């Protein structure tokens, strides 16, 4: 069966494959798959949230997935240092009103200054996405090797997967990412022009 041409969500593909191969989904697997569905769909808010996603989520809950625990682990609490770094990232948000495009950046020295691990900042794209006047949000994160990773989110009909593909990245219509050895200024120029 060709799942990939009709499905952009890895966790949906895994779920279908488990079902097709009669693999019993235990509680641990259900928690992992539901975590993926929640994050892939932005808590069931992005345009890739379909009736099938809700059906799968319901079945995973029936198999023992713990929605409360998953939500608390992902969204319910933030380390104090990561929260103080969030305020710095908010200060750096730039809004291009003409393009309805908001962006911000996290530098390597931010991780050191705030004593935060890079993975503790994954939620920051959702902070940039909160800018009401934007339909596209970008968070650029400097990597240890000096390269940059970009996380893109969109509202409405903007396909951020097309933007990510400029840099060899990909993802979904509403949530995509990329890596680049170019400077943040170059990245922004390519996106804005």
Please give the residue ranges for each predicted region.
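Short alpha-helices
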Residues: 1-56
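Hydrophobic helix-and-loop "lid/oligomerization" segment in the mid-to-C-terminal part
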Residues: 42-166, 171-192
């Amino acid at each position: 069966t060709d799942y990939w041409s009709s499905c952009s969500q890895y966790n949906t593909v895994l779920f279908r494959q488990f079902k097709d191969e009669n693999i019993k989904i235990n509680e641990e697997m259900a928690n992992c798959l539901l975590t993926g569905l929640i994050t892939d769909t932005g808590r069931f808010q992005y345009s890739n949230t379909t009736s099938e996603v809700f059906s799968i989520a319901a079945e995973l809950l029936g198999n023992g997935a713990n929605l409360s625990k998953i939500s608390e682990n992902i969204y319910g609490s933030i380390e104090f240092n990561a929260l103080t770094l969030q305020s710095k990232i908010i200060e750096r948000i730039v809004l291009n009103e003409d393009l309805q495009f908001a962006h911000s950046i996290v530098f390597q020295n931010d991780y050191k200054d705030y004593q935060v691990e890079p993975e503790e900042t994954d939620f920051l794209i959702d902070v940039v996405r909160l800018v009401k006047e934007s339909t596209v949000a970008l968070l650029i994160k400097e990597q240890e090797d000096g390269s940059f990773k970009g996380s893109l989110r969109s509202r409405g009909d903007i396909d951020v997967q097309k933007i990510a593909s400029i840099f060899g990245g990909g993802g979904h219509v509403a949530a995509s990412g990329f890596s680049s050895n170019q400077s943040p200024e170059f990245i922004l120029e390519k996106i804005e022009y």
